[in-house]
């Protein structure tokens, strides 16, 4: 480090260097994924601004297989003409110059989410490569950038009738710790945008996974958003309160809200379509007006006298779902990430609009107003009961030694960052865990039976539950609006350790519901983990090994089977062994797994037989006779193998749109007939290509006299599948496999070695990427309404791989 501090020490970061040097200032954290996804939102916000101005109706966001993302819209297209001052195309100025854009010229956009003119130029600076395509003036313009540097000027590459812009970018691994996009995070934001912009179609597709896509298009704006958020809950009044008011100063305030019979408060705030996670002046104005208007109404109508308990703002917001959306010509945020609105004029705008409109709503809808007031009074009484219960607990706690529950085996470490709390199912596993742990930093809390489902329980009832009270005391961070302080948490690693069966899953879900509803910050801060104890223990001779799950078990058995295996495809052929044989086995197993996954849509036997017939492709489908012959062969092989069970017959269907002939197979089982069309999508899919590749690899491989050998043992075979089955059976000789169902089956040493030793254990961190989706899932699975839960189970039942009953 130099001691010279003079004028030469002062660096001026020109162009996009500032962004690369301090990316966090522009897009948020580059390590935890928020900054990475913010890149997509910066580009999407530009398309939304086109929609706000009335020029864009369709936005398509695609996560490509190579983990790049493209955002395409049908807006006006970025201007392509030469910029009068910069002497390069306007598009290049927008892509490479900070604080350049159409948001400063008040005539181009009245209100916009883009504010500082840094959005797309930041994306360009922090991407390894950007491909810009503009459709404008009847021409297609294209330009490529590497790390923000244009490789050539904007060039015309074709003609078109459409207008719009497509930006495809590959994030830079030099900036981001992790460059993998999460579908749920993008889906959450795009869903919000589609509600906030009625009639705009937003499509999201993930090419990394089969059939993963969503189409968000909602009429009804934020009113529909509130209905969507409450759809699995029970609203206490039918009508969604909604107003949209535009003021003379250009600020427009739109609010939609509805109370449900739950106990959670859900308020979503937006400024110019951009969400404010930390609220701001619009939230303050909304809360103030809500409490004041409701209190005035309750005093006037005599509800306050009946209540016999003073109501607070928190009571008024219990069970409230609301969306507050403001449009502000020149908004001020606390940072470029726009997480908090600080424009002071917005608070009074929201307050005055809410006061007036909510008072009118309550006066015009007396029965709905009565329901809301009754709920607020109930909340106030419950809060009072909870306060008394807490005081009782505190008085009782003063008598206990250090106020910690007797069940808790605490650790010696006092630094929360180094301490771990294992929440263990049942006293027997708790005993093993207490004996096996490292006392220095591992505490154990055994929970007896199932804790209360907090989704259905009121706060005072929850506090009276013994298991919940024990858990709250052990955590040390308090609970409830007045007492809860996540900074007082005694352990920064809370590990849920339950059995690998139905009861274990249920207890884990109940605990996650508790943390999500009562202490969400613990999940947001990454303190909650789920232990992943092994499912199997295998023993061969004196060697023991723990195996985490079914997939690892299959891999272990295949590796064992390959040891010393030789495949002779005929009596005289040289042996196929080692890596070539292993690759073929892996290819076969991957295909079988694919068949199992696809068997939700087609019969397993039919898919499996595709491995043993030649490839069918688009070329073959143009010839009807060829398709008939191919289908006939498939059907004959199926009928020969499935004697008596099912009868297969041939049909061929002509697809007029594509002008191709497609195989259609009729299956008759126990007198019931079903038809299955092998569609053009299936024939052209990556999945079918993998089955066809295996078909070509196995075609003619096994000849007369073929045999498989492992060590000294030899077995004649007629198919590759028979060879693999024999090898697996052989490898199991002398192998003892134990499947663990409960943690209590392990002794303390085994529990330490497999689940508690930081060197060898596996844990899964609990995170929330899509808060709306998570809220919906907890409500569906753990709430009062049966119908949404039944629909969820019926929809997802076929996707279950292992059902433990």
Swiss-Prot record:
Where do the annotations place Mg(2+) 1 binding?
425, 499
Give the enzyme's main class according to its UniProt record, as a single word: isomerase
Cofactor(s) named in the record: Mg(2+); Mn(2+); Ca(2+)
Q: Which Gene3D superfamilies match?
A: 3.10.20.690, 3.30.230.10, 3.40.50.670, Histidine kinase-like ATPase, C-terminal domain
The reactions it catalyses are:
ATP-dependent breakage, passage and rejoining of double-stranded DNA
The record places the site described as Interaction with DNA at 450, 453
Which Enzyme Commission number(s) are on file for it?
Answer: 5.6.2.2
Cellular location of this protein? Cytoplasm
Q: What is its main location?
A: cytoplasm
**GO annotation terms (biological process):** DNA topological change; DNA-templated DNA replication
Task: List the GO cellular component terms.
Answer: chromosome; cytoplasm
Check the record and name the PANTHER family matching this protein. Answer: DNA GYRASE SUBUNIT B, MITOCHONDRIAL, DNA GYRASE/TOPOISOMERASE SUBUNIT B
Other notes: Few gyrases are as efficient as E.coli at forming negative supercoils. Not all organisms have 2 type II topoisomerases; in organisms with a single type II topoisomerase this enzyme also has to decatenate newly replicated chromosomes.
Could you describe the subunit structure of this protein?
Answer: Heterotetramer, composed of two GyrA and two GyrB chains. In the heterotetramer, GyrA contains the active site tyrosine that forms a transient covalent intermediate with DNA, while GyrB binds cofactors and catalyzes ATP hydrolysis.
Function recorded in the entry: A type II topoisomerase that negatively supercoils closed circular double-stranded (ds) DNA in an ATP-dependent manner to modulate DNA topology and maintain chromosomes in an underwound state. Negative supercoiling favors strand separation, and DNA replication, transcription, recombination and repair, all of which involve strand separation. Also able to catalyze the interconversion of other topological isomers of dsDNA rings, including catenanes and knotted rings. Type II topoisomerases break and join 2 DNA strands simultaneously in an ATP-dependent manner.
Protein name in the entry: DNA gyrase subunit B
What's the source species for this entry? Vibrio cholerae serotype O1 (strain ATCC 39315 / El Tor Inaba N16961)
The gene it comes from is gyrB
